[in-house]
Amino acid sequence: MATAATATAGSRAAVLLLLSLALALALRPSDAGAGGDCHFPAVFNFGDSNSDTGGLSSLFGAAPPPNGRTFFGMPAGRYCDGRLVIDFIAESLGLTHLSAYLNSIGSNFTQGANFATAGSSIRRQNTSLFLSGFSPISLDVQFWEFEQFINRSQLVYNNKGGIYREILPRAEYFSQALYTFDIGQNDITSSYFVNNTTEEVEAIIPDLMERLTSIIQSVYSRGGRYFWIHNTGPLGCLPYALLHRPDLAIPADGTGCSVTYNKVAQLFNLRLKETVASLRKTHPDAAFTYVDVYTAKYKLISQANKLGFDDPLLTCCGYGGGRYNLDLSVGCGGKKQVNGTSVVVGKSCENPSKRVSWDGVHFTEAANKFVFDQIVAGALSDPPVALRQACHSRGQ
């Protein structure tokens, strides 16, 4: 009887051990098997205005009202009436909205940080923000900020403690976090805006891929293992791009989008998809997800009325009337001198939830939510994994 009891106890212990190991593996973000949610403790984002939650506003002055009116009730560093796709990503993962790394007031970095700034590009711009509108915070600068953030946050976290442990991430979060990238749009548009030909614009794409690869590998070298990489959207459907280069507005598709702009965006995306596949082979211990936001955005624009939206090329927060309700010299919240008085003329439309374009460059919150809903389940991703399972997207 004693021998039987011992055997039974041993069997139970073995079963419990196996169950414990299985549970531990299931809860590890680093597990590569098909399984449950990844439980990312933080998100670190790199990008441009499509995901900027306050970087440029912290540097050069806040995005003015009516930006932020729909969700935040006030300007919140976003060039939008409300939330961006990156905000919906954070919410979906059960995390707080990301604070901009450059914002020194009221920020909390416990669950990540945002290095994106509006106007940023992969390559450094050979001009200034005030001349071109493009940010000096290129992708390599964003990575330098990220390195500084790791080093300085952990120095303070470990040596000062106290309140700092409530606003800074744990050291292990840097290897467990999801790293998101949404950048490249400004490299294409800025090249066109200096009157380059399509052939000249296309010629920079290989260099963009090399630079992007280098930065992603640098993030990998600092512990990053889970990457969620957005492609660029249909640039030929952005009113500001069409006004900057009206010669490229024709030929247009049935929606009024520039065929030329969009073909270059599609070429960029093709090369980006190849780049992500190459990274996947180079680093088989990491998870790289390529996310096709182009398809989500073009679906919204080309089927706007069917999906409950108004004219997708008509700017909500703009000025000037005309085809796009956009004057390039007057942005959203912008002012003009009227009879010697400075008057706000860049006003919001009555119902932003019915519009796709917020300010001629960026989407409304409603449009961003549509895009997020299209990508969150993984139907537009390669590999086709959901956001919450992006730690499982390893491939050969």
UniProtKB/Swiss-Prot annotation:
Record-level GO BP terms: acetylcholine catabolic process; lipid catabolic process
GO CC, alphabetical: extracellular region
Enzyme Commission number, as recorded: 3.1.1.-
Top-tier EC class: hydrolase
Known glycosylation sites: 108, 126, 151, 196, 339
Pfam families assigned: Lipase_GDSL
Keyword vocabulary terms for this entry: Glycoprotein, Hydrolase, Lipid degradation, Lipid metabolism, Secreted, Serine esterase, Signal
InterPro entries: Cyclin-like_sf (IPR036915), GDSL (IPR001087), SGNH_hydro_sf (IPR036514), SGNH_plant_lipase-like (IPR035669)
Chief localisation class: secreted
Membrane spanning residue stretches: none
GO function term, MF aspect, one: carboxylic ester hydrolase activity
Catalytic residues identified in the record: 49 (nucleophile), 359, 362
Stated family: Belongs to the 'GDSL' lipolytic enzyme family.
Matches recorded under PANTHER family: ALPHA-L-FUCOSIDASE 3 (PTHR22835:SF588), ZINC FINGER FYVE DOMAIN CONTAINING PROTEIN (PTHR22835)
Protein name per UniProt: GDSL esterase/lipase ACHE
Taxonomic source organism: Zea mays
Lineage: Eukaryota, Viridiplantae, Streptophyta, Embryophyta, Tracheophyta
